């Protein structure tokens, strides 16, 4: 934050977004806004490094269990990597309580939002949604949705089907949120949209940002069948040393630094 214009304050990632990182997203489509999980969850267990929530979604007849666990990652010498203090493992278990087979192929995991943390920050330089698929990083800024000389305006996008989708997320100049699916939880789509966010520390000035969700694998569930999805979520600083050290566990995660691209 520009200390000449904005008083010092703590930064909360995704603060101005009403939806939480790791929330379930339904009906992901390029033609309409998705719906979000409104299940009322209850905490059922807690340890020193994890918490488990459970709830029932009557509209979809799904019993849902979500466990958030701190996820320290070690290097080859057994030392915990500093960047892993910003990692959480999310495990989602779904139980189909319907008497019918359910098709959940348009479901996803919400990756939160990113936006400038000061109104003086360049609007289209550092804020991106991004994804890594087929060995390369793709990223777009908020104006991608407003159109220009060579493109038309779009309210939202659903990218895919994508090959080998290893991660997706959002980033601002200093912070990033990255969804990292385990192999069995890899999907092939990424949903993104542009949104205006108020900066509370700057008299609620609106700034443009981006929002992202990652699709789950094509999923059908028989009655009383349980499916489990697992994602590691990095929510922390865009600090090259942290991300570079995590490359061994999460290949190419440091590509979001994109030196020489911006």
Regions found by a protein language model. Give the residues of each.
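Soluble non-transmembrane domains of integral membrane proteins
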Residues: 1-259
């Amino acid at each position: 934050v520009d200390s000449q214009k904005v008083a010092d304050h703590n930064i909360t990632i995704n603060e101005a977004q009403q939806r939480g990182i790791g929330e379930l997203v339904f009906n992901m489509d390029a033609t309409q806004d998705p719906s979000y999980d409104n299940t009322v969850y209850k905490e059922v267990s807690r340890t020193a490094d994890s918490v488990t929530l459970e709830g029932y979604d009557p509209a979809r007849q799904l019993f849902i269990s979500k466990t958030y666990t701190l996820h320290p990652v070690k290097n080859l010498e057994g030392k915990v990597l500093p960047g892993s203090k910003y990692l959480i493992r999310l495990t989602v278990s779904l139980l189909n309580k319907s008497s019918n087979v359910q098709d959940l192929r348009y479901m996803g995991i919400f990756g939160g939002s990113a936006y400038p943390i000061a109104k003086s920050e360049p609007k289209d330089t550092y804020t991106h949604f991004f994804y890594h698929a087929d060995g390369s990083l793709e990223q777009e800024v908020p104006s991608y949705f407003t159109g220009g000389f060579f493109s038309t305006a779009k309210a939202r996008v659903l990218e895919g089907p994508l090959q080998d989708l290893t991660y997706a997320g959002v980033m601002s100049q200093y912070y990033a949120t990255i969804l990292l699916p385990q192999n069995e939880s890899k999907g092939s789509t990424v949903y993104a949209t542009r949104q205006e966010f108020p900066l509370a520390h700057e008299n609620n000035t609106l700034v443009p940002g981006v929002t992202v969700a990652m699709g789950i694998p094509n999923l059908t569930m028989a009655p009383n069948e349980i499916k489990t999805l697992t994602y590691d979520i990095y929510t922390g600083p865009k600090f090259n040393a942290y991300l570079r050290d995590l490359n061994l566990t999460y290949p190419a995660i440091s590509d979001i630094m994109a030196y020489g691209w911006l």
